[in-house]
Amino acid sequence: MNDFWQHCSALLERELTPQQYVTWIKPLAPVAFDAAANTLSIAAPNRFKLDWVKSQFSGRISDLARDFWNAPIEVQFVLDPKVGQRSAAGAAPLAPRAPLPAANPAPVTAGPAPSGAADANAPAPAGMNAATAAAVAAVAAAQAAQAAQANAAALNADEAADLDLPSLTAHEAAAGRRTWRPGAASANSEAADSMYERSKLNPVLTFDNFVTGKANQLARAAAIQVADNPGISYNPLFLYGGVGLGKTHLIHAIGNQLLLDKPGARIRYIHAEQYVSDVVKAYQRKAFDDFKRYYHSLDLLLIDDIQFFSGKSRTQEEFFYAFEALVANKAQVIITSDTYPKEISGIDDRLISRFDSGLTVAIEPPELEMRVAILMRKAQSEGVSLSEDVAFFVAKHLRSNVRELEGALRKILAYSKFHGREITIELTKEALKDLLTVQNRQISVENIQKTVADFYNIKVADMYSKKRPANIARPRQIAMYLAKELTQKSLPEIGELFGGRDHTTVLHAVRKIADERGKDAQLNHELHVLEQTLKG
């Protein structure tokens, strides 16, 4: 077991960057191997590392284990805080990498260290490679920051915990003002863990595992731009869309990317309900100074589901002040909601105008190809081979959001494992029988016709009539498009339900609306509202 892990670690060290290896792989350790069951247990020191390694590296480690033992090995990940302590005590060194080009790290700007502290800018001793030099420099910078603790602006840790406000230590405050150097963040694994815990980020949600399609490509492009240029591009960034479409994934991805690029950045992800709770507690304990000091000092604020601010005037007032302070300091604000900013009821006009001052992007329900890709990617991450036929069948019948797709896949995998059967379309139909019945019953062409007619203030009878004025023909085409997108009806069946129209008429309407949706923001918004209404 230990021989395998030394072999595996050596290979991964060569494949990954120094930062990735030291942060994610080096803290791991094998703790058990069951030859009879062909299972290998690998321990991680905390939940963050466990979740990240499981999602990002389990496949590669399983492949290496299979090659090493010439048999399929199930790799299991377990939590063991003592692993980090053993790792810190010093493991046997692995085979060295090939020499790296000399680094040219930027100077540390945390302020001069007092006498006796290590000099972060001192030249590396002769013979020290770039990765080691970067690590030494990072440790020196941390020592300098700790020495300057008396001068750092931070919250009292006890007061912060009372309000769910992680304390900002002097080390973090100084690190937030440093220019990042590749590899430096990995010098202190515990510090990296602390950053994740304080930020409340989920390290599993990254750009790498975010499936992109037409429905979300603009949102992803904007998110990457913001991650690369926080506080400069699109401030605030406002993402809106229905439940389970990837809004939360994207904003965590921005935070994770910034934390990798600037490990000392002061980042906070918070759900709007928790922010409301913090405001209430601050009011009850007369701790608004602490509250403001914390939120106004962030480099990146990620606030999810801001529609929960509706009707809460004091919360909105405090958020307005925080927003103004952050934007003035070139800090980035990212917000999500289930609807377009101007359609959120009970929100102060001042806030709505601030939301509109940046970039507002909709995330739509995933199209068919994207749904197939999501299922294939998720199955792969679970170590399961899913045929395209099965993925296509599921994607064709479940259209609303990513969570629904992932939930369906979990049902299929569990059903397959329980019955000991291969995953086929027949098994999938059995596993999803109840879900498919509900889906087929939920949305009918008749319901679509009525909803669209009400939305555009025309009569339902106009959907079947031969009238062709624009105020009737356009909604009728939209209803045909939605019927094709949201039901299992064929083109001829849809045409029959629209007054006996030919299937080519329906096809023309579907193509016309689909094409215009990508070009016309107003039409896209109207379709989004109709889809959400029909899906309840």
From Swiss-Prot:
Cellular component, GO, one term: plasma membrane
Keyword tags: ATP-binding, Cytoplasm, DNA replication, DNA-binding, Lipid-binding, Nucleotide-binding
Main location class: cytoplasm
Residues reported in the UniProt entry to bind ATP: G244, G246, K247, T248
Signal peptide, first to last residue: none
Annotated region (Domain III, AAA+ region), positions in chain: 200-416
Listed Pfam families: Bac_DnaA (PF00308), Bac_DnaA_C (PF08299), DnaA_N (PF11638), Hda_lid (PF22688)
Region (Domain IV, binds dsDNA): 417-536
Record keyword DNA-binding present: yes
TM region(s), chain numbering: none
Biased composition, class Low complexity, residue ranges: 105-121
InterPro entries named among the record's database cross-references: AAA+_ATPase, Chromosome_initiator_DnaA, Chromosome_initiator_DnaA-like, Chromosome_initiator_DnaA_CS, DnaA_C, DnaA_dom, DnaA_N_dom, DnaA_N_sf
Residue ranges, annotated region (Domain I, interacts with DnaA modulators): 1-72
Region (Disordered): 97-121
Compartments where found: Cytoplasm
Domain II: region residues: 72-199
GO biological process, one term: regulation of DNA replication
Gene Ontology MF terms in the entry: ATP binding; ATP hydrolysis activity; DNA replication origin binding; lipid binding
Domain notes: Domain I is involved in oligomerization and binding regulators, domain II is flexibile and of varying length in different bacteria, domain III forms the AAA+ region, while domain IV binds dsDNA.
Functional summary from the UniProt entry: Plays an essential role in the initiation and regulation of chromosomal replication. ATP-DnaA binds to the origin of replication (oriC) to initiate formation of the DNA replication initiation complex once per cell cycle. Binds the DnaA box (a 9 base pair repeat at the origin) and separates the double-stranded (ds)DNA. Forms a right-handed helical filament on oriC DNA; dsDNA binds to the exterior of the filament while single-stranded (ss)DNA is stabiized in the filament's interior.
Family in the record: Belongs to the DnaA family.
NCBIfam families referenced in this protein's UniProt entry, alphabetically: DnaA (TIGR00362)
Subunit structure: Oligomerizes as a right-handed, spiral filament on DNA at oriC.
Protein name in the entry: Chromosomal replication initiator protein DnaA
Gene expressing this chain: dnaA
